Amino acid sequence: MRFEVGRLVVHRNVRRGRIGWVRPARVISDDERGLLLWVAEGSAVAGEVNAAGLGMRAVPFAEWLTPTFQLKQGRWNGPPLLKFLPAGAAHSVWWFRDAQGRFTGWYVNLEETGVRWDDGGLAGIDIIDQDLDVWVRPDRSWEWKDEGEFVERLAFPEHYWVTDEAAVRAEGKRVIALAEAGEFPFDGTWCDFTPPPEWETPQWLPAGWDRPPVR
């Protein structure tokens, strides 16, 4: 399944069958290398919160384990993001920029390979974020990110969606080797990308954004 260039799709994170977050994105390209998406600053988004209205990262994981959740809509308050999901890979790469639009680094999001869906009116890709990440600077030096959260959650195997710690770390090391070598996509590709001016920022999540996950 391929997505048409310019189409608005939803990129969703799924946790044990529940939607964790939703971000609408425009398709820049979709080919044998993978899927390239653009998330505009200020886009309408949604994220899972507990009964107190707090997101998962705002509380200890032990306190997050409650049967009461809801999806809260809001705005993407981070920088505009370029997201590349390599075909068949267990990670995605995000290009970060500063307020002036200058490239500041690559964020490697370790995740289970995305599963696509297309309902006709709306399409998307569902991933399972594995929480451990890698930050790669423009000079290709790097560091692990969110390792504390990753280790904390591994202590709750009956509730956590990551089942193979070694595989996650191995994927991270594999991508780190690519970055250190300056190989694609850490070779300067897309660092100066600018979206077409006609691509409007999604002010509302498209109908069907909360359809049941496919994974």
Segments the model singles out, each with a brief description of its role:
Residues M1-P79:
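Charge-rich, low-complexity N-terminal segments
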Residues R15-R16, A25-R26, G121-A123, L132-D133:
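A generic local secondary-structure boundary/capping motif
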Residues D30-R33, A99-Q100, V136-D139:
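Short acidic-glycine loop/turn motifs at beta-strand connectors
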Residues L35-V39, R102-N109, S141-G148:
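Short, well-ordered strand-loop elements centered on a beta-strand within folded domains, enriched
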Residues A46-A51, D119, R153-E158:
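A short, polar/proline- and glycine-enriched secondary-structure boundary/capping micro-motif
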Residues G78-L132:
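Structured beta-strand/loop patches that form or line metal/cofactor-binding pockets in enzymes
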Residues Q130-L178:
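A hydrophobic, small-residue-rich beta->alpha segment in the mid-to-C-terminal subdomain
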Residues A170-R215:
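Cysteine/selenocysteine-centered motifs that mediate thiol-based redox chemistry or coordinate metal-sulfur cofactors
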